[in-house]
């Protein structure tokens, strides 16, 4: 890769990082392309060389979130509880290395909830169903006591809602320490694990 190509890639990544932070803090509708350009210390014209619109930039962030959401599906597990433990340990490790992941968590949550997001982008976020896959793992593991009794869908919903809440709080309070992974696992853990 030439020096020029490296500089272009660094600029593109800077735009993505600054946009992620602003979209997470202000939402899609209240973030202006001029705000992103200013945060990235570049002109709006230069920013448009990398992303043709605010919508395309936001879509890139949501696509990154969708790709990141596939990571837990790639985990090899010895028991069903390991899937959740390793997912959270992996998420926390990535966030420590790349804080942009916190902002992407917030953006994905906003995108699922907001009616102001362009529909095709919202569909990308709504197409991620970590809860359904997790509910299937919980249902299978309940038979062996790995998970507490109860509706697997509600347990999955509660677990991932707690994770989303943690990520959103860490995004707005960067000095906050990460909670214990065990605390999150306790939401779904069954008697066999005591």
Regions picked out by a protein language model, each given a short descriptive name:
Residues 1-10:
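N-terminal intrinsically disordered/low-complexity leader segments
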Residues 93-136:
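Short secondary-structure transition hinges
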